């Protein structure tokens, strides 16, 4: 059993900050490829006019998710820009807003009273056409995840309300402010999965969210809210499943094969919006935190340049040492602040030069085994790292490098400050 590590949350101010609507960008930069799976191709050309919510890129492959225009206006450019989802440059569509806020009406809202008589394939298609992917960081297309084979009955739906990443509070604010909408989203998922038991798993430190979840979900049949002292790593779906149900998914199996589906809070919120409001995924809540005077939770249009958010929040861009997108432990230190917000941008963490305190420099491994004892999936990170440094990829594979969940704990606990997680993640990609 791994020694699960408690990491300082750094959420004191941000968790108290209500969700604010951030202004639409004058120019949106929408990456065509933001999910795990097949890449999309543009459906528009330079000079085309687009409306809010119009599908602008898609793929014919099953494991994919379209992207939509977050604003109305005109396509001015199609080219490459830095993509924080994959830490590399990829294709994007530039849209200059016209200020008209004209909406596309392709997705017709389904009334809550009609949910139970709506065919599952219609709901799956809606989730797919809305471009919904895992918003907890994984980025896997939700329509594929919820298309469970009929011979694999789902017994338990776990609502992942743990939000283990330090600094991140976007999910926590959704739990507080959009609790009823989360329940609506859960009802959609339960219908698709054959009405399994629901366990809402959250942390006791979310003192405002826990009673809200208990109040709203406590009225539902076969539904339980569990609040525990979860560690950071237990925010991962596979580790959370073990903490709640007492068993883990073998390396050669998926969660659904064990009768369980784990779904993130933000994803559930997006499902409710798509089904009942006819809204594609064109915005998300993201936490602005770190070396900032006032941490915030912002409802931001996908495609908003991160520089816009920094400037409009009076952050000195000349004092930036590092901007991390998508979580301190598992996110990406972006190469340019002109990179746009994506579906997977759960947070924007700002770290300044002026507040930087140099830490210990990298030294040789001291054979303490901290990384091994703290790995939540029982790997040997330092041995994998040493194999990769030597270019011995066969050995790394034999050490189960592909089972790494990229939690970053090994680097966090390493007294020698070896780049364990970064090296392993780079090799996996």
Where are these regions (language model features)?
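Acidic low-complexity segments
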Residues: 82-140, 149-151, 207, 224
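Ferredoxin-type iron-sulfur electron-transfer modules in oxidoreductases and energy-metabolism complexes
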Residues: 346-362, 372, 376-429
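Hydrophobic alpha-helical positions that pack around
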Residues: 195-306, 312-319, 327
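N-terminal, Lys/Arg-enriched amphipathic/low-complexity engagement segments
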Residues: 1-43, 94
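Conserved hydrophobic positions within beta-strands
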Residues: 73-75
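Flanking helices and flexible, charged tails adjoining ferredoxin-like Fe-S electron-transfer domains
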Residues: 99-119, 123, 131, 136, ...
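Short histidine-centered loop motifs in beta-beta connectors
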Residues: 40-49, 53
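Short hydrophobic beta/alpha edge segments that flank linear recognition/processing sites
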Residues: 50-64, 79, 90-97
